[in-house]
Every structure is written in structure tokens, then in C-alpha cells.
């Protein structure tokens, strides 16, 4: 956080990450049942209150998502978790998105890749325009 993200942001760079605090809340809090208040407090300490301007959630029915993962071959520990775990994680992500609709973009991951790319770029372009305008 302090070595990479903050300096880049202070320098005016746009930072894109694969996962951030929302993933911890979804996976650890909702998926594994850890105390959400504790995760929120820990996240606030670790990030120093830093929050993304945009979180893109590629939403898919967990059963379908697991089918896609299995078709790729090798899986990791989280991907091998049972369907109920993935359903809880999905609910955790969707709950966060519903509480912060201005900073989340929820997309149907079953849509064609080109369509998803367009939707993401439209939202990112809008944010970049606000930043420079």
C-alpha cells in the first residue's frame, strides 16, 4: 500500500488492481463467516481509508463460474471450495455493490467479452473525464 499504491496515486497515476478490500470482505467475511466488523476495521487500518473509485464485478451464477473454472484445468484452493461457499461470496460482492452503486459496476459475466470491454471502458472513460475535467 505505502510502497506502491499511495506513491502512484500521489503522482497522479491511474492504478488498476486485480482485487482490493471488497474481495476480502466477500471471501473472508461472507464466504468464510469471519466477523464483518473486524474485517472492516482491519481493512481501514491496512488501507488508511484508501478506497477505489471503481470496482468492476464480473457477476456469474456460482455453478456456472465453477464450470468455467473446471474447464480451464488447474484450480487453486478457493476455486476448489464448495458451491455454498461461492454462493455466499457472490452474495457478499453483490451486497457491497448494492450499498455503493456509484463506485461499483456489476456486469453479467455471461455476456460477450467485447460487450463487457465496452461497458468497462465507458465507465472508466467517464471517471477519467471527471478527473481531468
Predicted ranges, named:
Residues 63-133:
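NTP-dependent small-molecule kinase module
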Residues 1-74:
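ATP-dependent NMP and nucleoside kinases share a basic, alpha-helical "lid"
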